[in-house]
């Protein structure tokens, strides 16, 4: 099967959608299919051989974050040429209503289209306003996937119709095999608390965690906060309370191998996000690596954590509740071991062996619905 995967977001900056598309492409290639990815990317950005650049992206505020998107006539020509040259059996477009490469690919598509919706935003005025203009294009989508119930509700609320829920996939074996590093491991007197996310994006929750750490340090003076992610380290350091700054190490972005080792090392991984999350791929990565997880009680996070059975939760944007639970977990080695074990088991349900099979089932359903009347004979024979 020849599959064209389309990312709306730039591969210059790491993100959950980009990781999902990259890993899906590699999973499909590993199964013997031919997969190619089209995504925005600056010139000179190192890209896997199967990723093709649609040109430089522009940062735009979107869903409480800054997304790097790509749009315009020149990009539209590149998209059309990539689709024609790829001779794909099927296009799998991610976030097809975002004004970027995905929407352009939807307009240019002539083959069957599967779309994955990642965004969770039930009050999107932009989506409501754009729906009448997008409706003819949306009718070209033969199969809809939402990465969570929250994303599915966003689709049904603003775009009509429905979508099958298939979560983001994670190579859980990669994280499970990670070896802890001594410099990131804690001791009873100096436990380590891990944060992973863009440090200058408020919805990732670092300010909430920093406030909570003030109380944590009063109870456990030797506690260390290890922060991983892109953003201005000097600016982030300056925003931290003085006592918290002294206990914080800003590690910057890490390679995939080091990220897995980081998650395998910390005593507790904290996800203090404040909103705008439809899934929570980093929670799955942390669980797969064996980190006990403490996350804000966003609906998407609670579902990933199996209703709280695979990780602990605290009241979103409540640093006092976060501090109380974090201190309790850091002081209880038995509970940490239980959270780690339950998290590892839960993470396996998001492995690519499971998720990939569900996505392929959607592909087959869409292609079978088009054959034999609309699919060229060569493609039916080679599938």
Describe the residue ranges of each PLM region.
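Carbohydrate-associated surface elements
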Residues: 41, 150, 169
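Glycosyltransferase donor-sugar binding loop
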Residues: 42, 196, 222-237
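Conserved donor-binding/catalytic core segment of Leloir-type glycosyltransferases
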Residues: 185-204, 210-214, 226
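Nucleotide-activated donor-binding/catalytic signature segment of Leloir-type glycosyltransferases, i.e.
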Residues: 236-261
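Short hydrophobic beta-strand element within catalytic cores of glycosyltransferases
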Residues: 268, 292-295
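A short, well-ordered alpha-helix in the C-terminal region of glycosyltransferases
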Residues: 321, 335-349, 358-361
